[in-house]
Structures are given as C-alpha cells and as structure tokens.
Amino acid sequence: FSMKNFHRRAKLEDPEENGVFKYRPRYYLYKHAYFYPPLKRFPVQSSSDSSEENGNGDSSEEEEEEEENSNEEENNEENEDSDGNEDEDSEAENITLSTTTLGYGGDVTPGTASIGLAALQLPKKAGDIGKKSAKEEESDEDEEEEEENEENEAEVDDNEQGTNGTSTNSTEVDSGNGHSGGDNGEEGDQESVTEAQGTTVAGEQDNGGAKTTTSPNGGLEPTPPPQDISGTTLPPSGKTTTPEYEGEYEQTGAHEYDNGYEIYESENGEPRGDSYRAYEDEYSYYKGRSYNSYGGHDYY
C-alpha cells in the first residue's frame, strides 16, 4: 500500500483522460484568499477599556453583575475586614482565574483573562458611590434575576468549599467548576477566598507559585536520585551483560570497535560505515521511474 492511491483524483469531464491518473498535489496553502474556510475569531486583547474585553456585547452584562455584586457587598457588610484583605483577594482571584479561565473555544488565554478581570475590578474599588445611583436606575426585574443568580452561585461555592476545604487548590477548582471568567459572583468568590486563604494563598507563597506540588521548599519538588537502585541492581560499568547470559546473548557494546561493521559491498571496494541495503533497495525501486509517483510512459 502506497501513497499513490491518495494522489488519484478522478475528473468528471471526459473518461478518456481519466484512464491515466495525473499527479495532482493538494494545495493546503491556497493561492487565492477566497478559497479559505472562515477562520475562528479570537477576542482582541485590550487593556484600554473593559467594555472591549470579549469583542462582543457580553462585557456590559458582566459589568452590571460586577456593579450589583460590589453594591451588595457594601450593603451586607459581612466581611468587615474586606478592605484589609481586598488586595490579597484580588491577587488570588487573578492568579487562580487567569490560569483556569477558558477563553474562546476552550483555549486558555491567560493574558486576556487577567487583563479583563483587572479592568473589571478597578471600578469596584474606585467609584462605588456613582454606581449606587446607576444601580437605583436599573429595573427591578434585572436586580431580582441577578440576585437569584448570585445566591445560586454562592450556594455552589459553599458546597464546593465544603468538599474541597482542605486541599490546596480549592479556589482553583471553584473557579474552574462553577463559573466562566468575569461572570462569577463576587460574594461567593470572596467567601471562598477568605475561607481558603490560610490554605491556598499560603500554599502558593510557600511553593513559589508552583501549584502542582505541596512541598514547602519553594519551586517544584526535585526528584531524588535513585541511590538504592544504582547501588544494588546496576552491573559495574565495564561489563555489558551478566556472566550467566554470555552463552545465550550476543554482546553488542563490549569491544571498542567492531570490524563487522566495515562492509565492502560495492564493486569499487569503497568502505561504508554501515551496510546500506535498505537504501539500495529503495533506490533501485526508483530506478527508471521519476520520483513523482506516475511517470508518463508507465501506462501506455
């Protein structure tokens, strides 16, 4: 079986020309632009404005949710120490969400995710008072729907935090499972982040940013050299095979140079480093025919 069968393409017009199949390579980079299928569009990475985060109109809804969440945090005042922990919370959210947030089509785009979150979090700290008036102007139906969504998200976060409370990557699992990107409820995230701060942020600082291992020595855990294995089972370096098997097996690397590799096969007696039998067979296959798999006179 050869690749020749893939190069055959029957023409529909005249069957006489079909009798001899021509070699027509497929062009994967086309000459003209209109032959291409429509390409997948990716979101443009922009740090200027948060409304251009996704390239489509989703960011306005995300901003409304962020306003809602920030105002509800002010009204509830569940975390009195939220001002002290706000920087650490935002850092932890940026770290975890930028690694686990999926971009368009399942591809991880950490740059856009972190930039979008930073741009969405800046107004939460700066201009809360202006957003209260903006929130009062919103319709009551939108507020009720968003409150229901936030309650559901907070319940999901609490359940996941109950299961993953002790593991070091609990906030990563939360942000990966529950939500996508900027749509997560700030309340649920702040609760989970403050609960898991003792584990997650400390674990990240101890590891030096390496989240895969739990070693406290900074960075990834180095694999120790297998001392006992090299001490017990490996043979000494001079021998290649153990003396029991010397009769059965052929020793390959025992001598410095093996004269069996010097083979004078060609007529001129030129030495070759190794026997070229496979190459000679392939070359003799291509003798008398051209390398494109159909010579002109083969079929006449």
Curated annotation (Swiss-Prot):
Extent of Polar residues compositional bias: 93-102, 161-173, 193-202, 229-243
Residue ranges, compositional bias (Low complexity): 46-58
Region (Disordered): 41-258
Cellular component GO terms held in the UniProt record: extracellular region
Motif window: Integrin-binding motif: 272-274
Location(s) in or outside the cell: Secreted
Keywords associated with the record: Biomineralization, Cell adhesion, Glycoprotein, Phosphoprotein, Secreted, Sialic acid, Sulfation
GO biological process, one term: cell adhesion
Basic and acidic residues composition-biased segments: 125-136
Any further remark recorded for this protein: It is possible that the segments of clustered carboxyl groups mediate the strong binding to hydroxyapatite.
Its job: Binds tightly to hydroxyapatite. Appears to form an integral part of the mineralized matrix. Probably important to cell-matrix interaction. Promotes adhesion and migration of various cells via the alpha-V/beta-3 integrin receptor (ITGAV:ITGB3).
Domain notes: The Arg-Gly-Asp (RGD) sequence serves as an integrin-binding motif and is required for integrin-mediated cell attachment.
Protein name: Integrin-binding sialoprotein
Source organism of the structure: Sus scrofa (Pig)
